Structures are given as C-alpha cells and as structure tokens.
Amino acid sequence: VGGDVEAGLAIAELISGMKKPTVSLVLGGGHSIGVPLAVAPMVTMIAPSASMTIHPVRMNGTIIAVPQAFEYLAKIQERISDFITGHSHIQPERLAGLMRETGQLTADVGTVISGREAQEIGLIDRVGTLSDALEELYGMIERRKAEK
C-alpha cells in the first residue's frame, strides 16, 4: 500500500475539486484505484461493454503482523470507500458487500460488475459512449456559459 493507492486517490481528489466541467467514461475495465478516479468527475459514464472490479485494499511483499499495520490498512480502505460513496450514489453497505464478495474472483475477494450494473447500483451515473460523454461535456460548458 502506498504509492499507487495514495497517488490514485490524490488524483481523484484533484479531479473532484475542479470547477471546470468534468466527465468520465470507463472503457474496458475500471479496476482498483480506477474506481475512485471514475467517480470523481461531475458526471460519470461507462461504456456498455466495460466492467468495474471492486475489491478491498491489497498488500504484497513483507508485512509486519502488528496491529498498527492492520489499522493502517483499515484507514486507507475507509478513505477510499468514503470517497467512492461521497462521489457516487452507491450505498456504503452495498459497496462494502461488493468488496467482500468471495464467490466471484478466483482465489480473491471482490466483485466484477458490468457497465449496466454499475449504473443500476448507483456507482456510475449512466451507460454511454464517447459521443455521449463529449456531448455531456460540451453541454455542461454551454450551460456554464449561459449562466454567466
């Protein structure tokens, strides 16, 4: 834990704090720290054939088995989960359940959800294409101009 997770969450915070119109489009597979990045913009979309993999924080390498290490993991997981639920419409309990699922990923914990399912559970605003994402972005820009 550290570099990738911390950097990804920091970038997601930057995107979510922008005042300029922002739209995301998940293509292929959104995985791991890609989930906070996907939900950070003002409007979020996912391609019909795309998927998202939701899983808890992972560690590899040498791990010191002390309570502090597990507390640190729990704090990072809480920060990520809070960001996701704060920038989408998914319920915290639903997100936690998807992260703890044991019947889907081989020898792992987590869930792979389809584009349509990501929308249905409130993780992503809607299913769309690049054209839809650009249309939304240009529409946001035009509405912003009209407000001035």
Positions of predicted regions on the chain:
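N-terminal organellar transit peptides
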Residues: V1-V35, V39-K148
